[in-house]
């Protein structure tokens, strides 16, 4: 039994040797620039102030959702997608300045967006209509998956 155990451990040790070093296609490191309820730590101005230092170590920074949610939120219940980028993390101008500073310091920006998380204006299916680059977007009750909650959403949509 000891021989079998020793052989197994020896095989595992040799497998681990292959995992050392950088992958052949390695091209950078990404930093998650936020955590849950990190409104002050992840403000656009706070992240921008760190851009020179972050640029020394990271190639990408993953930032939280930037759309307006109508209140203090991490952004996963966004109300506006195209027309209002004043979020819990700062204004649209501050966001644009952050992205510009990141680019100047060799950092790419990745935004965290969950498309199917929407906040409504007043009722269950009352989403704002927005126009972006001449195209008007309107989310209706029929745009919500009928089976994502056991049919409850479809029943509500059918009442509309």
Regions found by a protein language model. Name each.
Residues 1-4:
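Positively charged n-region of N-terminal signal peptides that target proteins for export
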